[in-house]
Amino acid sequence: MSLREEGGFCVAVLEGRNLTKTFRQGKLEVPVLHGVSLAVERGEVVALEGPSGSGKTTLLCILGCLLTPTTGRIVIDGQVITAGRPERLRDVRRRSIGFVFQQFNLFASLTASENVQYALNLKGWRGLKARRESDRVLDAVGLGDRKDFRPRDLSGGQRQRIAVARALAGPASVILADEPTGNLDSESGKIVLALFREMARTESRGLLIVTHDPLVRSVADRVMTIRDGRLTHGEA
């Protein structure tokens, strides 16, 4: 049974069910997450807030199949993927999840278009198909006329928009963003957040944003708060 249902049908594109995470430090087992459950629907923007050390980035990495939970399950597009082999988890990351991080992580030697196409190549998109998709998402984020520029020739806000375009390129149904406005001025942050809101609605993506930025509340459908590894507000 899904965490959020409507009329008997699952409407969540991403679910975490009773997630826990424990890290070993020497002889000690240190718990970081305690039975966290959440769901993100298609077309929905969810903000996840919490102080430093609260477990929010660990939770994001687990939901993105970058870390394995100690217990609990991840469900993406209705499929349980937690127990899969490493190769399957890698394929899920490439096919179903787009990532946006505070650090842009762009290749300095590649153009905006080539940066997006590189991500598409990892998803199995090649040649004309990849170029057309790159053009589409760069147009969508307002950088169609900058597609042949390299990152050094663009502003911080424009570089982050390339990162957004890269996450949106291809079939990803879930976008996970970790402090995406952290290195941006207020105006650039507003532009990036407006892009997130528009893309979630027009392309039916589910978007989870880990943030300290109060501006994110202006585009979020729901706000969840995590403290000491537990959701204290907005739990599914």
Each model region followed by its residue ranges:
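ABC-family P-loop ATPase nucleotide-binding domain
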Residues: M1-T22, T232-A236
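ABC family nucleotide-binding domain
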Residues: A12-I226
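H-loop (His-switch) and adjacent beta-strand-loop-beta switch element
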Residues: V223-E235
